[in-house]
Structure formats: structure tokens, C-alpha cells
């Protein structure tokens, strides 16, 4: 075994610093004594038991560490494991798994050669960045969701307000329609009452006029005994009209007939538009006979008929 392969030849496998030298850094000449070790100042957070792997016989620590600063660990590994076969150096099989640092193994003192303080390890930026990115993405997604939900709520609120306005307009239109219908119904009822009252008034007026006509006819019948020719002719026409209505097939009454003859020929069941049949007195025949027999009456039958028609028209015009 060479000097390079000492007790501390496995330390390069535990070293993770690429600037650190290989097994050549820990030689027998580079061992330091106990007083040199005590010269280093230790921080309170550094474990003291990490220095137990270093032998007290190592010396010239600082000089050897200055030489190993620019050493390449790959070159040291190649020189260490190289064998000469057939005049040519042939490297033996090398397992890279040996270079991996065990989980429970501590770093040696060689790592702290250039600095008295322990190395400060950077936090895992990749993991933190992934976590921060995931948090940022989650925050962005949640923000977008909140915005989308807020927009949906605003749209729903707007739709609700539009529907409420539409329903309010419908209610107002329905109330106006009902109010107009009530007013129209009241107007029709008022008009019906007015027309009904007017109809009643007209009917009462008709009855009043009928009663007046009957009173006038009765008054005329009272004056039938006065001997006035106009009244007699008017009564004769009334009797003729009533007879024609009651008996249309009977011949018309001659106007030359006397009232006594008309009364005798008229049946008692005929109605003259009064409450009862007209009763003519029997005393009317004597004055008429006396007048006809008088010397002053020289009118013939035809002239009497003509004169009576003219006098009746004059009475109507009056």
C-alpha cells in the first residue's frame, strides 16, 4: 500500500466540493499535531465530534491545502486506479456509486480548509420556485374563478333587475287596464241609469198625454148637445173611423145621417177610445128636426156635404 492510500483515502468519496483535492491531500507529511488543531476557532453550532476522523499525527495543514487547491479530482482518481498492462496504462473498473456520500456520514475537516466557518448551503431554490409557481398558479386560478364568479353574479343581478322591471311594467299595465275597465263599466252603468230614467220619464209623459187626449175627447162629448155643426161632424168622423177599425167589411157611415141614427145603428160593444161606449142623449133629435124644417134652411144634400168638408178643414187649420 502506498502512502497515498492512507486511512483518509476514502475521504474524497465523502467530499462534495469540486475544488477539493483527492487522496493526495491527506498524506503522512500533511498530518498536523494536536496544538495545530486547537488553534482553529470553532463556532457554537458546529459539532465537535466531526473532527474525530482526523488523526493527530497530521502536520503542515496549511501548506498542503494550498497545493491541493488546483487539483482535479478526476485526474487524481485516474492516476490512483491506473494499472499498466502490456506497456499501456489501463484503468480498472471504477464504481461511481462509491463517490456518493452516505446520508449519515459527516463532511471532513478538509472542506473547511479555506474558511474557518462551515459552508452555507443554499436553500433548494428549485423546490421553492416550484412551490411558489404552484402557489402563484393557484392564486391566479382562484383569482380568475373569483372574477368569473363575480361576473356571473353581476350578470345574474342584471338579469334579475331586468326581470323585476319587466314584471313591474306588466303589473302597472294590468292595473291600468283594470282601472280603465272599471271606469268603462261605471260609465256604462251611469248611462244605463240615465237612459232608464229618461225612458221612464217618456213613458210617464206618454201616459200623461193619453190622459189629456181622453180628457179633451170627453170635454168634446159634453159639448155635443150644443148644436154646433162642427162638433157634430167631428163626432160623426170619429164614429166612422172607429167603426171602420172594428168592422172593416161594413160600409162606411154616411155623413148625412143624424147622430141619433148613428147612435142607434152603433152597437153598445163598440169602443170610441174612452172608458166606455159613447152615450148620446135622445133630446138632440128635436132641435135638428126643427132646424131642417125651417124656412131658412135651403141647402140641398150635395151642398151640405161639400160645406161640411170645407168647414172641417177650416176647423183643423184653426
Swiss-Prot record:
Keyword Transmembrane helix: no
Name of the molecule in the record: Basic leucine zipper (bZIP) transcription factor atfB
Chain residue ranges for the region called Basic motif: 160-199
PANTHER family: CYCLIC-AMP RESPONSE ELEMENT BINDING PROTEIN
Upper lineage: Eukaryota, Fungi, Dikarya, Ascomycota, Pezizomycotina
A GO term, aspect molecular function: DNA-binding transcription factor activity
Major location category of this protein: nucleus
Induction comment from the UniProt entry of this chain: Expression is positively regulated by the developmental and secondary metabolism regulator veA. Expression is highly increased following piperine exposure.
Protein purpose: Transcription factor that acts as a key player in the regulatory circuit that integrates secondary metabolism and cellular response to oxidative stress. Regulates the genes involved in development and stress response through direct binding to their promoters.
One GO CC term on file: nucleus
Chain intervals for the UniProt region annotation (Leucine-zipper): 202-216
Location of the bZIP domain: 160-223
Alphabetic keyword roster: DNA-binding, Nucleus, Stress response, Transcription, Transcription regulation
Matches recorded under InterPro entries: bZIP, bZIP_sf, bZIP_transcription_factors
Region of interest: Disordered: 114-157, 275-301
Protein encoded by which gene: atfB
Pfam families noted in UniProt: bZIP_1
Compartments reported by the entry: Nucleus
Similarity comment: Belongs to the bZIP family. ATF subfamily.
SUPFAM superfamilies the UniProt entry points to: Leucine zipper domain
